[in-house]
Every structure is written in C-alpha cells, then in structure tokens.
Amino acid sequence: LSDIFSNLQIELDQLYSKGLYRTLRTIESAQGPEVRINGRNVLLFSSNNYLGLANHPEVIRTSVEATQKYGVSSGASRLISGNMTLHEELEQRIAQFKGTEAAIVFSSGYMTNLGVIPALVGAKDLIVADKLNHASLIDGCRLSGATFRVYPHKNLKRLKELLEKRNQYKRALIVTDSVFSMDGDIAPIPELLKLAEKYDAWLMMDEAHATGILGKTGRGSLEHFNLRPSEHLIQMGTFSKALGSFGGFIAGSKVLIEYLKNTARTFFYSTSLPPGVLAASIKAIEIVDKEPERLKNLWGNVAHFKNGMKKVGARRAVPLPDSETPIIPILTGENERTLKLAEKLFEEGIFVPAVRPPTVAKGKCRLRFTVMATHTEEQIERCLKILRNIM
C-alpha cells in the first residue's frame, strides 16, 4: 500500500482497538418486527419504521403502480425536468398535514438540513443550537458560515443568554431536534418558540422522529403541545421514519418555501425523489389519518416496553434516561461492554446495534431500542425476558 492508504489502515486499526470500528449487518427481508439476518430470524428493535408503514400493502401497491406509470427515476433535479405532479401533490399533502401554507420536498432528511440552514443564515448571522442535535443539523450549521453557538441540552437559561447578543447580527436561527434521536426526550418547543418570537429569530425544529408519532393524530410537536404554526417557526421533517418511505421536507410560509426553492443548493443540485417514493409518502400520510389504531398500538407497545425496561433497570442497576417516545435507550457506558451486550442480544435473537462515539459522547454508549406499532405483546415479552437474563 502507498503511504496514503497505509495511513488509512492505521486509523482503521486504531478505531478497532478502541471499540469504535463499525460493521454492517445485512438484512435479507422486509423491515418488519422480525427480520432475517445471515439466514436466521431475529426480532428487530432498532428500526425507525414506527407505524409499520414501510410494509403496509397499500403503500407498497401505490409505490409499484407509480413506478409502472412514471418510471423508476425522475430523471433530473426539480428545476430542470424532474418536477412531477407527484412532487407537488406530496408538498400539498405535507403542508395540510403540518398546518402550514406550503411545503418543499428534498431528497433526504440530511440533505434538507444541509441545504436549508446555509440558505437561511450566513456570515452576518447567528445560530444557537442544542448540544444533542442530530449530525445533519450540526453539519448544516457549520456549513452556513454563521456564528455558531451551542447551548447545553434543553438549557433555556443559557439559550436566553446567547440570544441577548441577537442585535449584533442580521438574522438569528434557533435549531433543535423536537425528539432527540439518541435519548428519546422531547424539546421544550413552547418555550423555544416564545424565545424565538421575543428575539425575532427563527425556530427550526427537526421533526424526523416526531412526525407521525407525537400529537393525537400524529401531526407532530405543534399538535403535541397544542400550538399553532408561527411565522417564526420552520418545521423540518422526514418521510423515512414513521411514514415508512424516504425523503425530507420543510413546511412553513409561502415566502419561506419560495425562498428555499431559489436558494437551497441541495434542492436544485440533487436529482429529485423518484415517483415510487413520492407515491408511497402520499399514501402513508393518508393511512396515518385513515388508520389511527396504528398510533394507538404504538403507544400501547411503548408503555408495555417501558414498564418492562424499568423493572430490568431496577434489578440490574441500568441507568435509563427519561425517554418520552418510542426511542428507549439503555445506557451501557463504555465501548467494549456495549459491543458485547449487543452481540449477546443478537445471539439470543434480538437485533439492537451498539451506539458509540461519535454518535454519542464518550462514556455514554448505549443500546438504543425502538418500538413499533407492529410488535406483538409476545415479541416484546421475549425481548424483555432476554434483557433480564443478560443485563
């Protein structure tokens, strides 16, 4: 190997020795409660397919029909020749779902955050962001060139202190996950929105793990907190979690959406989402309304699993964060212990990957369990029994 690649191998070896080397598990089946890996069936407790819509017969059928009608690809970016009727229909549906004037669809959630934040703020502007935000938000903030300040997790006092310097900047943007993907807790959206309005800032909330989950009908954080859309609020979300499809979106005012169509580089330099994915997302939104029992089943399963996990924690002294959602982590501490526990679970028929740095802070490794509406009581009990035996 040349020196360049020798250095890469050295770094890989260092990752391995620290317990930070990553490998891929290959799934040979659909993303259901039970999946096939390496020729054997295991229970899946790590998928974001919260409502089971990725496997819904109507979603699959609609996606196939759209592919047969329009083809596999859109063929270009939206601003060239890749703007299809399905893109506009999906944008109308998500705007209605989120209660906003308009919406814009991106090729992924990551690309949404990477494109939108630099489009809104730059060198003369201020960003204040929660410490535990998703990597895509962090990268979007860094890419923007704005003054980038981080406040301790959900620390409103420190956030207010940072916003006191708002008048030194042209624009200000508060950035937060609404549901934090590694801890499962919920951001204090009402208080954040009040601060945004007081200091004339935008509040951009990433609803990736809230859309389809929070609120009586799954519309997200605003419904959960009984809030109305505000000109200071930017709702970002994805179709790839509870909605079982793929892609990202921004929902907001018409002016905001038109501005992003003209300034967000990841919008006009990316091939647009394919017809089959668009049709699946449209159908998934329809099913969220048509089959409310899915959301009810999800929260019933979450309660069942959490109650069982608390007993595991009490017996085995496992520290459990205060999760408020279907994301339920067990903190395990160090890399090697986490890897061994994940491997032991897999041997016993439970697939839950080890979450390690840089996804979480050093010493904060965890097993991140996620519960789906389609898990059966028997499957949940089996998982809890195995946990009691190995923890």
Model-derived features with residue positions:
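N-terminal "arm"/small-domain region of PLP-dependent enzymes with the aminotransferase-like
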Residues: 10, 16-72, 201
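PLP-dependent enzyme catalytic core of the Aspartate aminotransferase-like
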Residues: 57, 61-65, 69, 347-350, ...
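Conserved N-terminal alpha-helix of the aminotransferase class I/II PLP-enzyme fold
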Residues: 61, 65-108
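Conserved PLP-anchoring active-site segment centered on the Schiff-base-forming lysine
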Residues: 116-135
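Active-site phosphate-binding strand-loop segment of PLP-dependent enzymes
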Residues: 149-205
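Active-site PLP attachment segment
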Residues: 217, 223-259
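Structural motif of enzymes handling amino- and sulfur-group chemistry
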Residues: 272-291, 297, 301
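Conserved PLP-binding catalytic core of the aspartate aminotransferase-like
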Residues: 296-303, 310-312, 316-348, 359, ...
